[in-house]
Amino acid sequence: MYYIVASDLDGTLLSPQFYLTEYTKKIIKRLVNKGIYFVIATGRHYNEAKEIQKMLNVPVFLITSNGARIYDLNKKLIYSCDIEQKVVKELLQKCLLNHDILIQLYSHNNWYVSNNNYSASSLYVSFSFRSKIFEFKTIIKKKISKIFFTCKNVKKLLCLEKYIISHWGKYVNVSFSFLNCLEIMSKTVSKGNSLQLIANMLGLSIKNCISFGDGMNDKEMLDMSGKGCMMDNSHYLLKKSLPNLEIIGSNKFDSVAMYLNKIYFKK
């Protein structure tokens, strides 16, 4: 049996309309009541992930900002890791010159954006969390957990990814959560490493975990788990990089909850 269940949110556990269905909530509650540990593993900020936790109304672990922050069942922060400030400064100096790319940053409590142009970059519904426009001279002094770049032109993001890896690859972990969203965290930060930490804390092996995801920021978690399942709607690069993983249905059809119901409750 898998004693830990970990799931991404957007494109995975959430519906395409960015909400938890009643069926999904029911299955997760049954799992927790059965003694299974449930982990939400998301690129979203804690201030958004905690709203999902409230909807579930059961104690769950939260891996937020792709692992830059981890919270236990009592909502206590148990791990944090920020990007080196010199890297944040140099990245912003480079990317602020390209006005087609929207720059967004997470600090511990806030969400910052380079401008208010969301027409090209609004990727998902925000759960009661509002952004602020940043100023370069002040933002570079703050502790930043995650930077993400969004753009209509995916080729520009692919070029940016190559540039970041070649110049700052030893300092940062780079991945696409969506086709048009490139995310940057500190080098050791990933959902996989975070799940390993939680498993260790519980006295379990990460091989006792089953995980679900759809983006490249889920790759380490899916690969390290005892069983990784990717969504039918997964990023094409994820399918290419982990060809042996089982592909379940789309997030349109409660596929994570249906899969969990099948393996835990035989229905």
Swiss-Prot record:
Gene3D superfamilies: 3.30.1240.10, HAD superfamily/HAD-like. The keyword Hydrolase applies. Its EC number is 3.1.3.-. The active site is at residue 8. PROSITE patterns: COF_1. The keyword Disulfide bond does not apply. It comes from the Bacteria. Phosphate binds at residues 9, 42-43, 191, 217. CDD domains: HAD_Pase. GO terms for molecular function: magnesium ion binding; phosphatase activity. Keywords: Hydrolase, Magnesium, Metal-binding. Its cofactor is Mg(2+). Mg(2+) binds at residues 8, 10, 214. Pfam families: Hydrolase_3. Belongs to the HAD-like hydrolase superfamily. Cof family. This is Putative phosphatase bbp_030.
